[in-house]
């Protein structure tokens, strides 16, 4: 039983499935464990039912979900969701993707370290990242481009003559410490936002992961919905293969038990929009044709950072959701190499 926030649903279901599997395996003679009851608060119900609908049929049939009231006195059985019901949920379509333009100031900053600095666009300006680590923000106010810098968003300084030395010191420290050649691997600049560092490398050339992927357009930190009521998080990368198949890419650089269920839920969200034609109409991939097939899921992690329970959890997912595991080199900061790729469910 659990009362928690929707964002914790993957952790809850992952740990529960592993406990259920291990306990069932230990019992070699009757009475066998035949059902898994999940008792949750109302806030967790919808995201949990969405994920249970993605499990393989035999396992899904063993699970019953109940909602407990706030006084923890009454249980109400929840009706399971069939897969087809997932596609009936109302969804807002995506707005058309505007052409990305880079301001003069942003171009000048990128030119100081073009292999390290990239830009993330938003409606209200541009965020500059050094190997994925945000360090500056550029906005145009009353026709004048202004730059704010600093790693702490709440304490960024406006770049002017009085702060020029601080700006130069920040760039110097980033060059020294946020580098694959950095000597001090314990430095905060080296350790911070590691997954964003990996994402930034793949954004530059996604074919390092799969030569069949199209380099651009490639969407990073892609949001299929707004708000966090159901624990909605952005997808690390949304890509398109040369054969027209969409690909959901989820990155991890440390062991994470939730990797599999996160990837499966991202598949559900992208597939719901694909079926409605939202992705094609928004021209997320320009005029390239998107195949009428569900997306693939690529789960990426360094070889020694894959969670020990990864395979067992992957085998809980329905086989029509194509999930692939990509093991990459441990020293990926110096360049990404795929060491192994395999279908896991």
Question: Positions of the model-derived regions?
Answer:
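Charged, terminal alpha-helix-loop-beta segments
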Residues: 1-345
């Amino acid at each position: 039983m659990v009362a928690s926030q929707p964002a914790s649903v993957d952790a809850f279901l992952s740990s529960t499935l592993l406990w259920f599997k291990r306990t069932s395996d230990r019992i070699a003679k009757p009475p066998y464990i035949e059902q898994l009851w999940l008792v949750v608060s109302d806030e967790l119900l919808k995201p949990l039912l969405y994920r249970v609908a993605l499990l393989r049929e035999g396992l899904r049939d063993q699970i019953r979900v109940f909602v407990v009231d706030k006084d923890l006195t009454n249980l109400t059985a929840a009706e399971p969701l069939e897969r087809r019901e997932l596609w009936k949920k109302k969804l807002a379509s995506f707005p058309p993707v505007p052409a990305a333009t880079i301001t003069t100031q942003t171009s000048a900053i990128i030119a100081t370290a073009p292999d390290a600095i990239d830009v993330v666009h938003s409606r209200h300006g541009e965020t500059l990242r050094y190997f994925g680590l945000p360090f500056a923000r550029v906005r145009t106010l009353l026709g004048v481009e202004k730059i704010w810098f600093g790693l702490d968003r709440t304490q960024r300084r406006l770049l002017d003559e009085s702060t020029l030395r601080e700006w130069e010191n920040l760039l110097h420290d980033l060059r020294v410490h946020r580098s694959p050649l950095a000597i001090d691997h314990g430095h905060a600049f080296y350790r911070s936002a590691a997954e964003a560092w990996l994402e930034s490398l793949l954004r530059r050339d996604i074919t390092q992961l799969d030569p069949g992927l199209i380099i651009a357009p490639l969407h990073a930190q892609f949001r299929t919905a707004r708000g966090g009521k159901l624990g909605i998080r952005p997808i690390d990368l949304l890509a398109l293969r040369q054969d027209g198949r969409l690909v959901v890419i989820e990155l991890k650089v440390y062991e994470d038990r939730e990797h599999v269920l996160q990837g499966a839920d991202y598949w559900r969200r992208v597939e719901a929009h694909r079926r409605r034609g939202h992705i094609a109409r928004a021209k997320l991939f320009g005029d390239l044709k998107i195949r009428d097939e569900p997306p693939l899921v690529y789960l990426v992690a360094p070889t020694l950072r894959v969670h020990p329970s990864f395979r067992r959890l992957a085998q809980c997912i329905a086989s029509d959701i194509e999930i692939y595991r990509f093991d990459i080199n441990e020293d990926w900061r110096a360049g990404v190499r795929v060491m192994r790729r395999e279908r896991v469910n």
